[in-house]
């Protein structure tokens, strides 16, 4: 029973009041570590033993992988445990996803059966945390993560998908021992917190892995640090035979593959294939293949990884089912396409809903590192090669601590005009800084006071 602490009792009536308060109570915006949140979680008796938990880490692709899994698992039979030999049984009643950050509304961070959490559930959770934490200082992210966990404990979904916020090893979500650990991609980002090279960053992301847990490594060229971490936690467990141990770790381009129609291994005339290999207890190779899969609007790498997760969960996969999921899955702000003539979206400066009448389509993408830049540039190149668009204008704002030069360089020769502006946050890069980075490969740059103005003039 928690004792009421008057000095930490808050009675804010609205969610916005709580969120404003949370921004003021911790000195550091990003403060990695599990010590503080673990203490408070223990006081709150955080326990997810009622659910199967999937934790997803990675530089890019986390949100899309989570969304694909969410769509796939809703209404699917849920195995009583996560053995791939387990027969499917009762229907899954609910699937919850915790992710960050949000695009328009804070409630987007936690959705249950694809519905965003309501204000009152969050307010109730915030009050409980405020009493429980006493004199322990929590960052905004730690506090809101605990709130999501309290809501999940009240709702008790059968499947919980956790998207790591930053890194993995020291991220607040890592207080939970998941049943499945997924690492999507490893690339350079958040160097001040995670390190300056893929090996160091990979180690941080691999920190979500546990022994006796299904581990899915989705990076097609995973750093050795990720593989070493997976093998280390796996070696610490006792298995009946090596085949049982091998089944726990699945690595892209070793155990599962995407095969393009141009490949000599492809057996279909168009689209692509997903191939999975494993060995039985006698060492015989077993193959499973999904043929004629649709080309994806979302990154194919994420679909490839998510399918391996589903296979490990014992979900029956068919090409028809997977194609339906590919067509269904879209994540806000990830190559999100709004068709002319009307585009409704929150203005970035004042958060009011504004209706823009457009003469052109608009693609919204929140990519902010070189890996994401390369993917988006490839998408736009594809559009141009198919003569879908004659002219592409980029409206760009970035944070000052991002690798602006290498994120924007892949767009050389693709973007016709650049509209740059500062974001409405303290960490924003100035227009001048972005111009300096862009001027090495383009002269068609226009500066604006804010993103809304830059967008209106595009």
Residue ranges with predicted function:
Residues 3-10, 76-93, 234-247, 252-255, ...:
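Intrinsically disordered, low-complexity terminal tails and inter-domain linkers enriched
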Residues 14, 28-49, 74-176, 192-194, ...:
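ATP-dependent carboxylate-amine ligase catalytic core
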Residues 1-28:
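Charged, amphipathic alpha-helical linker segments immediately N-terminal to NTP-binding catalytic cores
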Residues 216, 220-225, 229-232, 243-245, ...:
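C-terminal helical cap/extension that packs against the catalytic core
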Residues 54-58:
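Hydrophobic anchor at the beta1->P-loop junction of P-loop NTPases
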Residues 159-163, 178-323:
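Acidic, Mg2+-coordinating active-site environments of NTP-dependent enzymes
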Residues 159-162, 172-174, 178-182, 186-190, ...:
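Nucleotide phosphate-binding/pyrophosphate-handling subdomain across enzymes
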Residues 65-69:
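Hydrophobic positions on the alpha1 helix immediately C-terminal to the Walker A/P-loop
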